[in-house]
Design a protein with these regions (language model features):
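Short linear motifs at secondary-structure transitions and domain/linker junctions
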Residues: 58-62, 134-140, 247-253, 259-262
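Radical SAM enzyme core and accessory elements
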Residues: 148-286
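Short secondary-structure transition/capping segments
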Residues: 9-15, 41-45, 96-109, 129-142, ...
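Alpha-helix-loop-beta-strand connector modules within alpha/beta enzyme cores
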Residues: 41-51, 110-118, 122
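A structural signal for short, well-ordered beta-strand segments and their strand-loop junctions
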Residues: 53, 83-86, 123, 277, ...
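Radical SAM/AdoMet-radical enzyme domain recognition
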Residues: 1-88
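Short C-terminal domain-edge/linker segments immediately following a structured domain
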Residues: 26-28, 85-88, 115-120, 192-197, ...
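Flexible glycine/acidic-rich beta-alpha junction loops that bind and position SAM and/or redox cofactors
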Residues: 29-30, 61, 81-109, 122-144, ...
Length: 286
């Protein structure tokens, strides 16, 4: 199907606008399952307007030396690849301690390797735990008076960051390099509380939008990007299209560590945000 543009068109017409695509490395050795098919698949998605998320399973000693290469390949295809979601391997079945230690890799391990393999363009300090986005959800929820999907998962479940390509240097510039994320999140949380306590939500949101520029260092902001305007559109329009404008300019890097019987954490399971619904109507954490 990767080499069949008609198949891609049928998938798109059926309503699919984004594909999660397994992509474990940039060589045939690390990614034997679809190394040769990937360029054709991306070309088919490009022609049909379907966006792609690369999903590499990361295994220590197997492909952990190619994390930077995966990000660079995504960079070359940013018109269609909008995210890379790394998944440190889940070790299933019977496995001795030595074998586990050979293959086990954690979220912090991956983040450290990414810093090394991107020559410091994406550092360990550029990442945030997933629930950090809750203040943004809270202020949108307060303004719209409608419940929104909350990523209130356990802090150790995963991490993420946004990186942008400087139009002139072609180097990555992480969001944290030119935006005071901590200050912005505190503003969102404070204004959400003001709206909930009865303050006029329209005046409050206008104040939020007005203050956004103060959190952005325009001198360090990548050429061709207006982050404050982009954030304002997301807050005021609250639509998928406004979020899409963000992705066109940037690349999301995510990390989710799936659990196995050797590192199972009940607190993480209880706070999972993604679930399977079984035929007998049980809800099982992803």
């Amino acid at each position: 199907h990767a080499m069949d543009p008609e198949a891609a068109r049928e998938v798109r017409l059926a309503g699919c606008n984004n594909l999660y695509l397994s992509f474990d490395g940039v060589t045939a050795r690390t990614n034997p399952k679809n190394h040769w098919e990937i360029p054709y698949a991306l070309d088919s998605c490009r022609k049909t307007g379907t966006t792609v998320v690369f999903v590499p399973t990361v295994i220590k000693s197997i492909n952990d030396h190619e994390l930077g290469g995966i990000i660079r390949y995504a960079q070359k295809n940013m018109d269609v690849v909008h995210a890379v979601n790394f998944q440190p391997v889940s070790l299933t079945g019977r496995m001795g301690k030595g074998e586990r230690e050979k293959y086990r890799i954690t979220v912090p391990d991956c983040i450290q390797r990414i810093e090394e393999q991107t020559n410091g363009e994406v550092t360990v300090d550029d990442w945030f735990p997933v629930p950090s986005c809750m203040p943004l959800t809270n202020v949108i929820e307060a303004f719209s008076s409608k419940p929104k999907y909350e990523l209130s998962i356990h802090f150790a479940c995963g991490a993420g960051t946004y990186i942008f390509e400087d139009a002139e240097t072609k180097k990555f510039v992480p969001l944290t390099k030119f935006c005071d994320i901590q200050g912005m999140l505190e503003l969102f949380e404070d204004k959400a509380e003001e709206i909930r306590s009865g303050k006029n939500k329209y005046f409050t949101m206008l104040e939020v939008v007005r203050k956004l520029k103060g959190f952005v260092d325009t001198k360090k902001q990548p050429a061709g990007l207006d982050l404050a305007k982009m954030f304002g559109n997301i807050l005021m329009k609250r639509s998928f299209d406004s979020v899409g404008s963000w992705h066109v300019k940037g690349l999301f890097l995510g990390m989710m560590h799936f659990q196995d019987k050797y590192n199972e954490d009940l607190e993480r399971l209880q706070r999972c945000d993604i679930h399977y619904l079984t035929p007998d109507l049980r809800i099982v954490p992803f």
